[in-house]
Amino acid sequence: MIDKMTQLVEDSLEEAKELAIAHRNYQLDIPHLWAVLVKPDQFAFQFYQSLEINTNQLIEIINKEIDKIPVLSSTEKSSYARLYSQRLKNLLDDAHQEMIDLKDQVLTVEHLILALFNQQRNPITVFLLEQGLNKEKLYQKMHRIRKGKPAISSSQETIYDALEKYAVNLNQRALDEPVNKIIGRQDEMNDIIRILSRKNKNNAVLVGHSGVGKTAIIEGFVQRLVKNQVPKNLQGKVIYSLDIGALLAGTKYRGEFEERFKALLNDIIDSNGQIILFIDEIHSIVSAGRTEGSVDAASILKPLLARGKIRIIGSTTHAEYRESIEYDRALERRFQRILVHEPDLDYTMEILKGLKPIYENFHGVRLEEDGLEAAASLSKRYISDRFLPDKALDLIDEACAAKRLASHAYPVQMTNLSQQLISEKIRLLRLTDSDTDDKFKLNNHLEQLEEQKSQLLANWQRERELLDQVQELRSHLTALEEQANLALENNQVADYVRLEDEEIRKCHQKMTALEKERLDSQKIINVTVTREDIAAVVERLTGIKVQGVMENERDRLLHLEELLHQKIVGQDQAVQKVSQAIIRSRAGIQNPKRPIGSFLFLGPTGVGKTALAKRLAEVLFGSELEMVRLDMSEYMEKHAVSRLVGPPPGYVGYEEGGQLTEAVRQRLYSIVLLDEIEKAHPDVFNTLLQVLDEGRLTDSKGRTIDFKNTILIMTSNIGSTNILQSLQDSGCITSEVRYKVLDELNHSFRPEFLNRIDETVLFNALSEKDMTGVVKVMVSDLQARLLEQDIHLTLTESVYILLAKEGFDAAFGARPMQRTIMQKLENPLALYLIQNQKNKEKETFVTVSVKDKKLKFTFS
């Protein structure tokens, strides 16, 4: 048997055996092997196709030959494909002889294809001869793809035409496909040209954050190459982009990746400097193939780069450059780094304006100038974990897609008319024969509605047709403008003038006429993308309210203090200051570099500090659960502080991130409540300094978390003793007591922490008069819970006064009142409900009054 064959030949023989077993054939024969070899993704299939063989007919003949092979009646699989047929043995022997004659070290699929021609009567050979194929053509083809080199590798078939298999010709793609217009970045392109023109170290690597336009710079450079807008030494050069996925695909055995990569690099070397390789995400190839006892791609590249055999352009991010390339000093020296910075807002606007026609043509919409400005400014402000211009383009794409979807849907008026028609038809069917007048009126009304609906549908369809025609003309206009620009670049002035003065002008006139016809008719479809559409996308992606204040929200903001007072009693100053911060934020005049508001609530326990934060979350977000709450008593130890931003690398929980940073990252627009802040370890305050001042915090993974759209509320019991004493003595918080509380605060917290807080609010201790309001708030919650069980609870005013008096405790605020209500109200009601389970389906009315200084319950 053959000493050594390629992995593809071995695998093909194994697969052919499985095919023979599946067909219950006694012997493994040539048709089984050829059925495997000519699968569409196999080397032989591509080999035959390149020789213009009709592969479909070839596969049909192979399948017919398999059907002719005798089938065993035995059901024992061990009896199938036990032997090689004589003609398959002869084929392998002839292939081995071809290998020897060609001075190859391994038997390849090519040897099998050659050996098949020694069996002139084989139907497969007969067909190939009829197609004009012979050994001479096969030898010529082998010499071309091997470039005169012998077969020495066990993965020989995978390294032929490596450049075409594992890389993409960017020059050809730029000529064949329409490419996006590249706006700006001329400095970076000139840097690439300068580096490629050097004698030594003529390899460039673009380093920048994801989304800043590294790949776009290469596309722009390729466009300049294709148009010969480069120095003479670079004219005629071809850029190939490495397809890392194709290079790694199917590399099951050690060394396969290296052989493919070396073959690709050899093709580049053979081009004598005409080919430049572009490696996107170059960090992924540097360590590719790295296993124990083998070399990686960097080890293959370094000698070639050092000798100047190849030229490479790479792109990567700052972090990956540091980890993969900068880490390997020898590799780093071979590259010249080009830093690609994030564009500023003005530069981003230039890019967006340049790409505007592309998005308009694709989606069939119109992009307003304010929409572009909103995409740049809002993405910069509210999407902090990505970079311009990519994030701005994403907003535009998303808004255009949403507008396009809405423009193809039936208008709301038509939906309303359809629903109205159904309602009227139901009414008509329910009328009796005696309701003659009503039937007559309804039938007339139905006819009117049907006519309105038909007219609306016709108008909508006509407008839709006009919009489709406008979009076709716009696409045609873009193509004409590209032709005109190309003519101007090629100095074809006559063609340029003809296109500009005739075809482009006619196209503009047709578009203007169609737009006028649409505007003159009843305009139903909206295809204009404005600032509001972009803001809606930002709000949907981040949860941050950036749209203009709507009418219902305006009412809520104007009455925010009243809404908060519904649940918060006796804390006018605190409610006022928090409300003002929210209104400043929604009006858009607060400092955009700081949180919406940062507050330190001081006061005795049970006076409403935490309750105000909960109520604020309920009013703004619809639920008090929509709040990030951290109990700072859990952060008393020094080692617990790291849980806020996440443990450092190597520690348990590193992948989960920090409790504060992760919560805010998922809810960018939220209320952050740090309860009982004085109990936290002093190092916590160092962490919070950056949040209070700059509105950001870096977690353990190096990600910057944006706190600019949060309301930070910290509560503390510091000074509560002085406040209670003041109330007992004078009934209010005096200026002397306020001074004492602030003095105690200064002793507890550092000045740099206190100076960064927007407002320090002293909560009043609740008086007996305030307690009546607290009782009403708590009872209203109880009434809402009972109403779910069809129980209506009513209390007389004297009950509220009695409960307030019995539950009042100046030292502990409203918390004792919860126990009083539980004992005086909830317990008797619970007992009644248990005793009357049978009447649960009936509505129950409960009235509570006072008799002899005790509560009296009346059930009905």
Swiss-Prot record:
Q: Where is this region: NBD2?
A: 553-765
Q: Where is this region: Linker?
A: 343-543
- Domain Clp R: from-to ranges: 2-148
Pfam families noted in UniProt? AAA (PF00004), AAA_2 (PF07724), AAA_lid_9 (PF17871), Clp_N (PF02861), ClpB_D2-small (PF10431)
Q: Which PROSITE patterns match?
A: CLP_R, CLPAB_1, CLPAB_2
The record's section on CDD domains has: AAA (cd00009), RecA-like_ClpB_Hsp104-like (cd19499)
Q: Which residues bind ATP 1?
A: G208, H209, S210, G211, V212, G213, K214, T215
Q: Which GO terms describe its biological process?
A: cellular response to heat
UniProt keywords, alphabetically: ATP-binding, Chaperone, Coiled coil, Cytoplasm, Nucleotide-binding, Repeat, Stress response
**Highest taxon of the source?**
Bacteria
**Which SMART domains did the record assign?**
AAA (SM00382), ClpB_D2-small (SM01086)
Q: Indicate which residues the UniProt annotation says bind ATP 2.
A: G603, P604, T605, G606, V607, G608, K609, T610
Main localisation, per the record?
cytoplasm
User: What Gene Ontology molecular function terms does this protein carry?
Assistant: ATP binding; ATP hydrolysis activity
Chain segments annotated as coiled-coil in the UniProt record = 393-522
Q: Member of which family?
A: Belongs to the ClpA/ClpB family.
**Protein's job:** Part of a stress-induced multi-chaperone system, it is involved in the recovery of the cell from heat-induced damage, in cooperation with DnaK, DnaJ and GrpE. Acts before DnaK, in the processing of protein aggregates. Protein binding stimulates the ATPase activity; ATP hydrolysis unfolds the denatured protein aggregates, which probably helps expose new hydrophobic binding sites on the surface of ClpB-bound aggregates, contributing to the solubilization and refolding of denatured protein aggregates by DnaK.
Q: What is known of its domains?
A: The Clp repeat (R) domain probably functions as a substrate-discriminating domain, recruiting aggregated proteins to the ClpB hexamer and/or stabilizing bound proteins. The NBD2 domain is responsible for oligomerization, whereas the NBD1 domain stabilizes the hexamer probably in an ATP-dependent manner. The movement of the coiled-coil domain is essential for ClpB ability to rescue proteins from an aggregated state, probably by pulling apart large aggregated proteins, which are bound between the coiled-coils motifs of adjacent ClpB subunits in the functional hexamer.
Q: Outline the subunit composition.
A: Homohexamer. The oligomerization is ATP-dependent.
What is this protein identified as?
Chaperone protein ClpB
Source organism phylogeny: Bacteria, Bacillati, Bacillota, Bacilli, Lactobacillales
